[in-house]
């Protein structure tokens, strides 16, 4: 069981994640019944808008942009990029120029217009251009008022560490080390990092980590070289004292590169290499040696790591190709880890398919290896190298011609060991809101390995989510089921819904029961008119629209769409006014048979909202109670005002499309 309770008080967000595990006794294996509670994290957090940062008190993780991320229990202040508008997020160079007159500035990248604006005569700077996430020079056209043009080229390429000119990103952490292993000592440490965007497409970054057993300093620089790509280089110097070992000093160098070859459609999304000397350790590695139970030796330390991720667009209708490669070597051991992934994907009409290949090579000391069934291994220098290769093909075919919202899937996987498995399945959604998803799969293995089948369902309901499934294979049968959801206690009562995300929205529409929310599968208002919308975007406009087709016959909404901008972790509320009652198209007559003039206003029971009389004295009124008073006015004099005292059940009327048609005298 997973519990994620939380409390919002003003700008503060208190969060907790606790699990409960229960294992029933197995008499065959003499295993006793056990139960255990585990707290995964507890923290209080709030945003500090002037600093564009989040303050965290309790459990958290340090940023991973300069040092490896470290789990902690303490205090951290770190910038939150989501607080920036979209036009200032990510990296984009500053575009500078001089306009001779009132001019239009047009910026193109790879032939596409990505920015347009108008500037006054004189020097100008454009700093609010959206980050494109790729590379390719920016072609700037300054179109003067007389029709003449200036043309500039601004180099552009990006890496995750790059910042806009003048932008700063920082973090300050002071805490205890928090390990998943309870026997590891809770050593204190402090960490500070900073990244600053310089002119000319450069970024400088630095950081430090400090504790009694470990200190490190890092310094790096990144540069946007335009057509030549983006490069960052950094170095880290570390002084460490592992438990029951001598002091050690080492350093680590890292280089990263990104480049988009527009003409060939090739994108090097990341290419990196890190080299560390034999005396270099990370903060996590040192802290993990300080265990209460026994000595934790550092026998395998990374010497170097190379990684490459390449994406290749093969052109129209030809699909795309991607390659990922990782290789690691270690000090004091001949261990080597290699991983290669190659995939091709494409679609034809509505059929999508892909071909994938993976190769993984890893090793363990031969003293740990005793499984006689692992035949595909290489024994070298006292180590066992396991070489695993898998080739797979996948295809997905929509069956809308015969079964709506249904897909047929097929995949085949073949490994170097000779095992081949075939899996065929059907997947789809049911119900009016497509909130019941289902899947059926059958698997066949050529050597009897992997033979089996499974059935799974997932129902997203207004009050939570229910999952259930059944599977079998040669090892046995498995039945799984689960229920998850969210409960919100607020000033108006209790609202139950689907699992709450980090940031959520409470819909308040009293009287509008069982009304759906657009683009929210299974989300509907409860019997009081309240609903929970999970997973809202913090610091962004979230538009919540109620589905008018699901409104009850006796309910109308004054507004059907609202926009809110919640902070991170908030539960924002959007209010809707629902008119509950009859929908009436009433013809108003005064002086016996004269229609009330066009444009007259009608107030129900003296309320603030007014309806307008149309042609032939007709007025549409929603949410009308069974009886009441209508105040009609088309002038200030008494002869241009009248009232209608109505009782819908006692007047002659007819009904058409859930609208009551009637006439009333206005006296």
Please provide the spans of the model-predicted regions.
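Short acidic/polar hinge/loop motifs at secondary-structure boundaries
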Residues: 119-136, 531-534
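Short acidic loop-to-helix transition motifs that present clustered carboxylates
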Residues: 122-124, 211-214, 238, 328
């Amino acid at each position: 069981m997973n519990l994620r309770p939380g409390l919002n008080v003003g700008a503060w967000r208190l969060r907790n994640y606790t699990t409960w595990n229960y294992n029933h006794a197995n008499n065959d294996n003499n295993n006793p019944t056990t139960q255990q509670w585990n707290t995964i994290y507890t923290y209080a957090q709030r945003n500090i808008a002037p600093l564009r940062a989040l303050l965290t008190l309790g459990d958290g993780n340090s940023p991973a942009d300069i040092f490896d991320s470290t789990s902690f229990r303490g205090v951290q202040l770190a910038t939150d990029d989501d607080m920036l508008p979209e036009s200032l997020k990510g990296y984009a160079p500053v575009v500078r120029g001089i306009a001779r007159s009132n001019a239009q500035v047009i910026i193109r990248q790879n032939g596409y217009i990505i920015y347009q604006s108008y500037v006054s005569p004189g020097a100008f700077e454009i700093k609010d251009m959206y980050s494109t996430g790729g590379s390719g020079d920016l072609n700037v056209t300054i179109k003067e008022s007389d029709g003449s043009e200036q043309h500039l080229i601004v180099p552009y390429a990006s890496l995750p560490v790059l910042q806009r000119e003048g932008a700063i990103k920082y973090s300050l952490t002071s805490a205890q080390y928090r390990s998943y292993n309870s026997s590891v000592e809770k050593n204190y440490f402090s960490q500070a990092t900073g990244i600053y965007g310089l002119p000319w497409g450069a970024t400088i970054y630095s950081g430090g980590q400090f504790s009694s057993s470990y200190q490190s300093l890092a310094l790096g620089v990144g540069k946007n070289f335009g057509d030549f790509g983006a490069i960052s280089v950094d170095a880290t110097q570390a002084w460490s004292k592992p438990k029951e070992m001598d002091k050690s000093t080492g350093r680590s160098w890292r280089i990263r590169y990104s480049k988009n070859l527009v003409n060939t459609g090739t994108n090097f999304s990341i290419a990196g290499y890190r080299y560390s000397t034999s005396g270099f350790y990370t903060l996590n590695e040192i802290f993990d040696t300080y265990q209460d139970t026994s000595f934790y030796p550092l026998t395998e330390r990374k010497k170097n790591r190379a990684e490459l991720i390449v994406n290749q667009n093969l052109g129209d209708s030809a699909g795309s190709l991607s390659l990922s490669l990782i290789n690691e070597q270690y000090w004091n051991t001949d261990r080597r880890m290699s991983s290669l992934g190659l995939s091709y994907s494409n679609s034809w009409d509505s059929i999508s398919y892909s071909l994938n290949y993976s190769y993984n090579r890893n090793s363990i000391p031969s003293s740990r290896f005793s499984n006689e069934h692992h035949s595909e291994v290489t024994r070298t220098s006292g180590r066992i190298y396991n070489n695993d290769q898998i080739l797979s093909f996948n295809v997905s075919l929509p069956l809308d011609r015969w079964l709506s919202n249904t897909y047929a899937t097929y995949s085949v996987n073949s490994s170097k060991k000779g095992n081949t498995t075939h899996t065929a399945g059907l997947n789809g959604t049911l119900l009016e809101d497509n909130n019941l998803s289902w899947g059926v799969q059958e698997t066949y293995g050529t050597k009897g390995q992997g033979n089996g089948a499974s059935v799974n369902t997932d129902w997203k309901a207004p009050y939570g989510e229910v999952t259930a499934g059944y599977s079998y294979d040669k090892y046995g049968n498995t039945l799984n089921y689960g229920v998850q959801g969210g409960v919100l206690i607020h000033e108006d009562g209790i609202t139950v819904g689907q699992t709450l995300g980090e940031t959520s929205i409470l819909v308040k529409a009293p009287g509008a029961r069982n009304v759906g929310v657009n683009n929210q599968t299974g989300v509907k208002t409860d019997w009081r008119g309240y609903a929970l919308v999970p997973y809202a975007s913090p610091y962004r406009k979230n538009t919540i629209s109620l589905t008018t087709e699901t409104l009850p016959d006796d309910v109308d909404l004054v507004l059907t769409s609202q926009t809110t901008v919640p902070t991170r972790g908030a539960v924002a509320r959007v209010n809707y006014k629902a008119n509950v009652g009859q929908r009436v198209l009433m013809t108003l007559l005064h002086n016996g048979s004269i229609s009330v003039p066009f444009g007259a206003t009608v107030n129900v029971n003296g309320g603030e909202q007014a309806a307008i009389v149309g042609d032939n004295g007709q007025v549409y009124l929603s949410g009308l109670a069974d009886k009441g008073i209508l105040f009609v006015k088309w002038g200030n004099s008494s002869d241009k005002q009248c009232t209608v005292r109505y009782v819908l059940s006692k007047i002659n009327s007819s009904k058409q499309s859930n609208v009551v048609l009637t006439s009333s005298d206005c006296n």
